[in-house]
Amino acid sequence: MPAYRSRTTTHGRNMAGARALWRATGMKDGDFGKPIIAIANSFTQFVPGHVHLKDMGSLVASAIEEVGGIAKEFNTIAVDDGIAMGHGGMLYSLPSRELIADSVEYMVNAHCADAIVCISNCDKITPGMLMASMRLNIPVVFVSGGPMEAGKINGPGVTRKLDLIDSMVAAANPDVSDSESEQIERSACPTCGSCSGMFTANSMNCLTEALGLSLPGNGSLLATHNDRRELFLSAGRRIVELARRWYEQDDASVLPRSIATRAAFENAMTLDIAMGGSTNTVLHLLAAAREGEVDFHMHDIDRLSRRVPNLCKVAPAKNDVHMEDVHRAGGIPAILGELDRAGLIHKDVPTVYAPTLGDALKKWDILNGDEEAAHLFKAAPGNVRTVHAFSQSSRYHELDQDREGGVLRDKAHAFSQDGGLAVLYGNLAEDGAIVKTAGVEASILTFTGTARVFESQDDAVAAILGNRIVAGDVVVIRYEGPKGGPGMQEMLYPTSYLKSKGLGKVCALITDGRFSGGSSGLSIGHMSPEAAEGGLIGLVEDGDRIEIDIPNRTLHLAVSDSDIADRRERMNARGASAWKPNRERVVSKALQAYAAMTTSAAHGAVRDLSQIIVKTRI
């Protein structure tokens, strides 16, 4: 029987000092035998997805202590990718994931906590906490802050839905007046919560449901809705039960590595492909799998992408559909239910709240008629500007159960039988590249264009806004990978500006950087190996022909092998300046340290620990 970890600091005469300090936090004599549950919160006033989380830790703590646990809360950092976008701040976004993972590990292990509730929401916070949970392998429940309500703007006879991306596209469109642009800006993000489309934050919060580590509704129930209160309370009660099952009953099935197995990771990726989630999820799932020693790799994603249909299109792939609409259609259990009926998921995997995913779907898939499930998924937007959680209790009169023409389709009526994400290979991406096919027009699934090469996102943006990019061009942005950036910046501004210039359907953009979950169009990222590691993208020249064939999963530079060999020889002859960008960029010591340790996007951009010699015994 495993001993409670916390007893290292709460039992024994030699721990008198530790107990004295615990008492100073409010613990009493009767508390020292109870499980100590860490609450990893991520409240910050910088991020709308986290601005309402200040009191969520106390709410979870009340539920933990009500059922006999001791709750101890701490906070992690949280970077807002939208605010950090388009300038040097974006260099810090992906590296912050590793800091978050480390900070959770440090706090939990330093204080010998028995289990964790992870209160996350936005882009790198959920992945960082997921990585830490897979490392620690103690009971965990995830509960997110929830998605933002979609923005709304009234037009002639119609109300149009908006999100963050609309404000960016409008601002760069010279045909949009200043007053109209300002109106869109003021309307795009009306409430607290993670941005309202199927962007990275919401994609990851949905995937925790598929991994079995969060409760139904975690990814889709709005941040503003009063029903979300019960989600936090349930997480608090559930974690104490899981802790007792592990430490008192030796039930290892409740541990993250028993729940988030290879089969569960396949389920999560299958969900991601079906709902056209953010390409960043590929990066984060690979990283989490690696932390948990799960045998799940890029070739598995490629295999799944070839057989999973695109069942759901959400902004940015479909501008009038947002997370509130996905919720009305039954949320993640409904999507998983359709995938189950298509024979595409493993339903015998455990979850934190049901013996198996199959058992969970019997109750929570709205097509099965459960009243509690119907009540949960009727939670609707309040349409009132607010930064407060639980501020409204609006409900839809009826659910969206139309699986032929609704927000969520069954396999027979899928948006496409080819999924929403694809892995491309070829001489430009020997280790793979990622494209969100759900956001690509059918007319450009195959595309041949002329390379326009840039060694920074800033230069590419200047060319697009300066009308130097034309139909048929392939914008190549290199030296923006994990090492080359460093930090693998998101390319939301270039893709948004291509849209605003009317080039979104007649140009492509390829990069060793990555894309925001808000990006759409023929945008191919995560090219591996990256330029800074000798990838062929570093040898592309202006005027080269680039061939993209998504149906056949290829990405090819149409230059002869002999010419490529000559270019590589000339590059290597540069000595210390070889495989380095021709640009001015100040890179801090912290980012230099990240660059020195990181791996390629094909491995999740995690740290290469083989560089470190670890002494297991001293």
Swiss-Prot record:
UniProt modified residues of type N6-carboxylysine: K124
Cofactor note: Binds 1 [2Fe-2S] cluster per subunit. This cluster acts as a Lewis acid cofactor.
Binding sites annotated in the UniProt record for [2Fe-2S] cluster: C122, C195
A Pfam family reported for this protein in Swiss-Prot or TrEMBL: ILVD_EDD_N
Residues given in the record as Mg(2+) binding sites: D81, D123, K124, E490
Listed GO MF terms: 2 iron, 2 sulfur cluster binding; dihydroxy-acid dehydratase activity; magnesium ion binding
Cofactors that this protein relies on: [2Fe-2S] cluster; Mg(2+)
Annotated metabolic or biological route of this protein: Amino-acid biosynthesis; L-isoleucine biosynthesis; L-isoleucine from 2-oxobutanoate: step 3/4; Amino-acid biosynthesis; L-valine biosynthesis; L-valine from pyruvate: step 3/4
Cellular component, GO, one term: cytosol
EC number: 4.2.1.9
GO biological process: isoleucine biosynthetic process; L-valine biosynthetic process
Reactions listed under catalytic activity: (2R)-2,3-dihydroxy-3-methylbutanoate = 3-methyl-2-oxobutanoate + H2O; (2R,3R)-2,3-dihydroxy-3-methylpentanoate = (S)-3-methyl-2-oxopentanoate + H2O
Active site: S516
Domain of life from the UniProt record: Bacteria
Entry keyword set: 2Fe-2S, Amino-acid biosynthesis, Branched-chain amino acid biosynthesis, Iron, Iron-sulfur, Lyase, Magnesium, Metal-binding
The keyword Lyase is annotated on this UniProt entry: yes
Function: Functions in the biosynthesis of branched-chain amino acids. Catalyzes the dehydration of (2R,3R)-2,3-dihydroxy-3-methylpentanoate (2,3-dihydroxy-3-methylvalerate) into 2-oxo-3-methylpentanoate (2-oxo-3-methylvalerate) and of (2R)-2,3-dihydroxy-3-methylbutanoate (2,3-dihydroxyisovalerate) into 2-oxo-3-methylbutanoate (2-oxoisovalerate), the penultimate precursor to L-isoleucine and L-valine, respectively.
Quaternary structure and partners: Homodimer.
Entry-linked NCBIfam families: ilvD, PRK12448.1
Family: Belongs to the IlvD/Edd family.
Identification of the protein by name: Dihydroxy-acid dehydratase
Source organism: Gluconobacter oxydans (strain 621H)
